[in-house]
From Swiss-Prot:
It holds the Pfam family Pkinase. It comes from the Eukaryota. It comes from Xenopus tropicalis. This is Casein kinase I isoform delta. Its EC number is 2.7.11.1, 2.7.11.26. The gene is csnk1d.
């Protein structure tokens, strides 16, 4: 039996869950495109989806803010329909063997600071900054970072007067302990500074592969939070960032120096990392680590397949010279995939030619690739925070291998 939502969206398989609801793959029947559908039982003790959808609507139009297609109630469920996005940074981090290059970390940092700045400009703090809550776009938007999950977001100032909320103590920890700011651990009301400090820990997580306070054992959740807090406070920033450019320590020291109601200097923090990016000689080609890994994997698989076909062809036509070097153009389509032509160029341009891992002639065989369905979330983007050329990535996020693409949403995503 076909299940429909809002008389327009066909409900498909479950692709994720969170503490505030489950996420399903869906189809917009009128537009013939996939969407993400978030469901929350109306009988839940503390309904959150309606509040979250209202925050999403207030954020609409911003760079990297998910587009909401429909909200309402259907039977016993509150429903929010959003456009479909690609994998989270946590998914991609695992795909890249839990280590990002400095270039990738800096490309991400630039966009992530901008996402947080935008949310703050709309009078909210996110309060759950972590890799799971940043997703990459699909297709033409494959180089852009999106921020999701406003289930824990809170208004920190009055929209009209900009009067800041009062300083409070003895607050319970809200968010994810691994990335929580020290003040959050101490029970202090969160403000803008805490979102940015959390981002600093996320960036060092990407650099290091793990944080010193991961994997601590404790009998209860409260005791574990206390152990994480103790380890975090006893680890000097310079020790945490040892072996990495000083900008990361400078960033964290700046965030920790902010007072409760201070407005952070987002431009200064962005410029800190942009200057490092340029000093390292990196190019704003928006080729991330996962693009390069997939590119190499495609090349190896294609080369092996081409050699196999050439051997078979030579055996069938040993005297036919045209049989040698036959390109491998035939490919069986996988069930549940669609062939697309990537929007990003697959041939090197003047600023990417030096980094191309394969010759131009081989790239033509990449023009048609299989795109698997990815985890749900929405899309809305502008190029205002991209200082480089976003259309030069050789492979888009939508082309990462199925072990990431089809993995679905982690259980901690999309509360």
């Amino acid at each position: 039996m076909e299940l429909r939502v809002g008389n327009r969206y066909r409900l498909g398989r479950k692709i994720g869950s969170g503490s505030f609801g489950d996420i399903y793959l869906g189809t917009d029947i009128a537009a013939a495109e996939e969407v993400a559908i978030k469901l929350e039982c109306v009988k839940t003790k503390h309904p959150q989806l309606h509040i979250e959808s209202k925050i999403y609507k207030m954020m609409q139009g911003g760079v990297g803010i998910p587009t909401i297609k429909w909200c309402g109630a259907e039977g016993d469920y509150n429903v929010m329909v959003m456009e479909l996005l690609g994998p989270s940074l946590e998914d991609l981090f695992n795909f890249c063997s839990r280590k990002f290059s400095l270039k990738t970390v800096l490309l991400l940092a630039d966009q992530m600071i901008s996402r947080i700045e935008y949310i703050h400009s709309k009078n909210f703090i996110h309060r759950d900054v972590k890799p799971d809550n940043f997703l990459m776009g699909l297709g033409k938007k494959g180089n852009l970072v999106y921020i999701i999950d406003f289930g824990l977001a809170k208004k920190y100032r009055d929209a009209r007067t900009h009067q800041h909320i009062p300083y409070r103590e003895n607050k319970n920890l809200t968010g994810t302990a691994r990335y929580a700011s020290i003040n959050t651990h101490l029970g202090i009301e969160q403000s803008r500074r805490d979102d940015l400090e959390s981002l600093g820990y996320v960036l060092m997580y990407f650099n290091l592969g793990s944080l010193p306070w991961q994997g601590l054992k404790a009998a209860t959740k409260r005791q574990k939070y206390e152990r994480i807090s103790e380890k975090k406070m006893s680890t000097p920033i310079e020790v945490l960032c040892k072996g990495y450019p000083s900008e990361f320590a400078t960033y964290l020291n700046f965030c920790r120096s902010l007072r409760f109601d201070d407005k952070p200097d987002y431009s200064y923090l962005r410029q800190l990392f942009r200057n490092l990016f340029h000093r390292q000689g990196f190019s704003y080609d928006y080729v991330f680590d996962w693009n390069m890994l997939k590119f190499g994997a495609n090349r190896a698989a294609e080369d092996a397949e081409r050699e196999r076909r050439e051997r078979e062809e030579r055996l069938r036509h040993p005297r036919n010279p045209a049989a040698r070097g036959l390109p491998s153009t035939a490919s069986g389509r996988l069930r549940g995939t669609q062939e697309v032509t990537p929007s990003t160029p697959l041939t090197p341009t003047s600023h990417t030619a030096n980094t191309s891992p394969r010759p131009v002639s081989g790239m033509e065989r990449e023009r048609k690739v299989s795109m698997r369905l990815h985890r749900g979330a929405p899309v809305n983007v502008s190029s205002s925070d991209l200082t480089g050329r976003q259309e030069t990535s050789r492979m888009s996020t939508s082309q990462i291998p199925s072990r990431v693409a089809s993995s679905g949403l982690p259980s901690t995503v999309h509360r």
